[in-house]
Amino acid sequence: RMPSLSIDLPMSVLRQKLSLEKERKVQALRAAANRNFLNDI
């Protein structure tokens, strides 16, 4: 069980980092879209 755990842990950490970066990109895109929207008005 221990070896599989040592492999699983980094994978979950990587997955968390990836989802965090994806979230950040989405937020940035949304902010840019909001700015463009406000500029268009």
Curated annotation (Swiss-Prot):
The modification Isoleucine amide is found at residue 41. The keyword Calcium does not apply. Its main location: secreted. Pfam families: CRF. The lineage of its organism: Eukaryota, Metazoa, Ecdysozoa, Arthropoda, Hexapoda. InterPro entries: Corticotropin-releasing_fac_CS, CRF. This is Diuretic hormone 1. It is found in: Secreted. Keywords: Amidation, Hormone, Secreted. It comes from Hyles lineata (White-lined sphinx moth). GO terms for molecular function: hormone activity. Disulfide bonds: none annotated. Regulation of fluid secretion. May stimulate primary urine secretion by Malpighian tubules and causes a dose-dependent stimulation of cAMP levels in the tubules. Belongs to the sauvagine/corticotropin-releasing factor/urotensin I family.
